[in-house]
Swiss-Prot record:
Coiled coil feature spans: none
Cellular component terms (Gene Ontology): cytosolic large ribosomal subunit
Gene Ontology molecular-function annotations: mRNA binding; structural constituent of ribosome
NCBIfam families to which the protein is assigned, alphabetical: rplM_bact (TIGR01066)
CDD domains per UniProt: Ribosomal_L13 (cd00392)
Gene3D superfamilies (UniProt xref): Ribosomal protein L13
Keyword annotations from UniProtKB, A to Z: Ribonucleoprotein, Ribosomal protein
Function: This protein is one of the early assembly proteins of the 50S ribosomal subunit, although it is not seen to bind rRNA by itself. It is important during the early stages of 50S assembly.
Organism annotation: Nitratidesulfovibrio vulgaris (strain ATCC 29579 / DSM 644 / CCUG 34227 / NCIMB 8303 / VKM B-1760 / Hildenborough)
Gene Ontology BP terms: negative regulation of translation; translation
Subunit structure: Part of the 50S ribosomal subunit.
Protein name: Large ribosomal subunit protein uL13
HAMAP family according to UniProt: Ribosomal_uL13
Length: 144
């Protein structure tokens, strides 16, 4: 018997919608990253992008444990001397809640061209409305 190696024609991608309300950030991000990579499928191959599309709604209602709202910091640099900016999780959740989940999942994906392609299959929205109704995403109840 030969080992099955998937080809781009064999990849079957599905659309799922996840409600992030009252879910813990890290636990939700790990399961999303797992599905984006396609590791839940028997035909997983580490050199191919065979994961599913994930639509996350209610990202502004995500929870964190402990004192992370005050203590967790996000850094970005402008490229100029002294241009390091620091933002707390609390401020980022208030202004751009989509970025919080995107940054958490990005850190769990491969740091190469394949990881960037996987991240494009993640769609994060505030509220319950999303523009992907035509794809008929099935609700996905993630368990921890």
């Amino acid at each position: 018997m030969k080992t099955f190696s998937p080809t781009p024609e064999n990849i079957n991608r599905e659309w799922f919608v996840v409600d992030a309300e009252d879910k813990i950030l890290g636990r939700l991000a790990t399961q999303i990253a797992h599905r984006l990579r396609g590791k839940h499928k028997p035909e997983f191959a580490p050199h191919m992008d065979n994961g599913d599309f994930i639509v996350v709604v209610n990202c502004e209602k995500i929870k964190v444990t402990g004192k992370k709202l005050d203590q967790k910091k996000y850094y970005n640099h402008s490229g100029y001397v002294g241009g390091l900016r620091e933002t707390s999780l609390e401020k980022l959740l208030a202004s751009k809640p989509e970025e919080v989940l995107l940054k958490a999942v990005r850190g769990m994906l491969p740091r190469n061209r394949l990881g960037r392609a996987m991240l494009t299959k993640l769609k994060v929205y505030r509220g319950t409305e999303h523009p992907h109704a035509a794809q008929k995403p099935t609700p996905l109840e993630l368990t921890y």
